């Protein structure tokens, strides 16, 4: 709707301007401060300029009123125009708030957790954010592909195999073992050890078989990770292996050398990342010739940046903040525009239950498992709460609040609005087709404002995507639900003179809730279950 109104205003003003959304919809649905920017050029007061501009909009079908207020030009949308938009939305509900197909393309890499154990709650935040960003981008018309980079090489995979070997020796063969400083623990390691022992037999468990054991366990963990993601309604398009890029390492090093991006010192090869804003240079090849994790990651990013996407987006844990300058430096040395590599950081999550820290999982050792939290509160509540705050800010929440059936639980509160609307239609004995002819002319000011809010979803979605600020969607839904509940409590619906107008208004509110919830990966309920 905002883009339609913007274009209508531009036809008359014939100049550049910005369109704002005033908080108080009783004053205006949209406003522009254009008069202030023209004041110096026209040598007039903003109030006079705004009054002159307002006079150009007399008898315009889109606007109920256009007024000059304190130098601002305030626009109120007409009921007739809102009704036209309502008819379009209700006639094609699956297309409501969708964007036209766009040329811009994106590749999102996210989750990419080491396949050394089940997903924990820290992984879950980036996973939910990435999946919702994907749903939103595709809804708005962008080509948006997703990828999981499987770290299936290096020391962490070896440690997985070693941890299973030591568990077999200690818990099954009852040998005395000495654990290294770093190893994987938890019930899942013991379970893997038991399964591996049954599969491979006693003779297999020696140090020379650690790589084979690690490979077997890595594949098992990747299957488990995919199951964890599916439980949270997350599907990633493709999984790419770190190992598959090893053969391309030498060619990448040659390219970096050619562009003076690397140098040799102390028997190591260094990335000259300090030349591009990093705090120091980074080792990419060790003295023994083995590549560091950064080396493989540079090869992978070179491949991603070469695939023709307009932008490559990564979602990383906040602890990877220092990794950004070195990766952008490598891409610049390789001839890419580092602005086309966008990094979104997912901050830490703290969980409480009844005000106390949530207990760590015995299955995972020192972590809270994503699957455990979903088992307690469901994937809908998990997804909502992870999207309720900006991704790069710390999030703390008490899962007990998400199990309540009252207004303190936002998922319940919004779902209750959606279910309430279905209940009202059932009570009236009507369906949406029965109210399509209603013209909405009887709506009072609060009703018009509620209708405007419901129809304004697309503008919210565009803002959320462009700013990567997905919390705008749950914020919108909370406000919409609150305004609906208030309006419902203050207005008689079934049996009223304007019953059809009100039911048509409510159907738009329900459509907005259902659409926005769907983009968040949440199912809108038609009936509340107790």
Swiss-Prot record:
Its EC number is 6.1.1.19. Gene3D superfamilies: Arginyl tRNA synthetase N-terminal domain, HUPs, Isoleucyl-tRNA Synthetase, Domain 1. Signal peptide: none annotated. The keyword RNA-binding does not apply. The keyword S-adenosyl-L-methionine does not apply. It catalyses: tRNA(Arg) + L-arginine + ATP = L-arginyl-tRNA(Arg) + AMP + diphosphate. A motif ('HIGH' region) lies at residues 113-123. Belongs to the class-I aminoacyl-tRNA synthetase family. Monomer. This is Arginine--tRNA ligase. The lineage of its organism: Bacteria, Pseudomonadati, Campylobacterota, Epsilonproteobacteria, Campylobacterales. The gene is argS.
